[in-house]
Amino acid sequence: MSGRAFERYLTIQFRHLGYRVKLTSYSHDYGADLVLRKWGKKTVVQAKRYERNVGIAAVQEVVGSIAYYKADNAMVVTNSNFTKSARNLAHRNEVELWGRKEIQKKFHIKE
C-alpha cells in the first residue's frame, strides 16, 4: 500500500467513525493529509505509512498545519509506532498519536 492509498484508507475509516473528511492535495498539503470535522471541531491529520517508527518531523509538520487550516486539534496516524522524541514533542503540543494498536482499536480491526 502506498502512502496515498493509506491516506484514502484512513479517509474511509474516519468516515465510518462519523467524521466529514477532506483529503488534501498530494503536494502543497501544508503539513496535513486529512482534515476532519466532527461536532464543530476541525482536526488536521498527518498520515505516515512507515515500516520504521515515525519521528519528530511528522509531529512538526502537523503542528505547522494547525494555523494554516485553523484547526482545533492535530493528530499523526501511522501503521507503525513512534519514537520517544516524537511522543515527547506530541505531548508538549497536544498532538494525538495513533499507532498500529490505536488504529486497530479505534477502527475495530482484528489481527
Sequence positions of predicted segments:
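Mixed-charge (Asp/Glu-Lys/Arg
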Residues: 1-111
